Amino acid sequence: MSHPGNGTSGPALYPGMTSTALPAIAHRYLTANGVRLHVAEAGTSGPPVLLLHGYPQHWHAWRHVIAELAADHRVYALDLRGAGQSDAPGRGYDTTTLTADVLAALDALGLPAVTLAGHEWGGWLGFHLILAAPRRFTGFVAVNAPHPWLPHRKLLPQMWRFWYTALLEYPVLGSWVIRRTGVLAWLLRRGRPGLPDADVTVFTGPAREPARARAGQQLHWQMVLRDIPRRAFGGYRHRHLSVPALLLAGTKDFALSPRSLTGAGTQAGQLAVRVIGGAGHYLPEERPGIVAAAIRELAPDEPAAARVPSP
């Protein structure tokens, strides 16, 4: 698998993305938890913000939010294992390993604590991060993402919305479907009507690589094998949220109804839910100003350089 050179480089390119699209964003590659990860960076001063993408996207999903924040924040948009231009090894797509990847990336970047934002899969991962290492995060904004404390009575009626995941999660079939990118393109257009073809290509292009197609399949399969049973059998019931958190949801989100996100219980006492009228599944692209404003609410006035990472 080929990569640009080590260190800071010019814009990382995908089919459909021009080299002049985002001139203020630098790119680097770091080793975290034994995997080479790609990160896009912008801004030179202010509190640090870490952005985690959803599926089938990568760092580029945050481009408009980065533009909103870079003037007074240091912004880092990470390509998760298997996505974008990060390495795509044959294993490690369970939430526990992905959590370790991100924490190791923070260490490699020299960031003791950050404000975290995650979209969709990145939002689900974000909840695990703030539960696993709360002292590493000054605040968390989840975008178009479920939280771990969804009551069964609210979750079960929503399961039909995820019918398409059956095409992606099973070994062999999932990789085959993902490589052909048609379902991925449908997901992107379904979630954000009017998405330009060039942006669809930017996000689906990496999935044509066999290793990345398998990574996408494994991501969904590990959710079926681990996270869904954990939630079904009360694995999050005694995990208490101690980091200030805000969940943004769109009234037109095809994958997640805002009505299902309320009533998290006392475990999620610091979680607020904010519903954005008329918005769909890709808020970082549809309403970047609103997402950036939410991040600003939870970001400290000054970088939390003195924070001590949790073990």
Give the role of each language-model region.
Residues 58-59, 124, 279-280:
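A short, glycine- and basic residue-enriched loop/turn
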Residues 42, 276-278:
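Conserved beta-strand termini and adjacent loop/short-helix elements that scaffold enzyme active sites
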Residues 31-33, 53:
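Short strand-coil-strand connectors
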Residues 302-311:
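Alpha/beta-hydrolase-fold serine-hydrolase catalytic core, especially in secreted/extracellular enzymes
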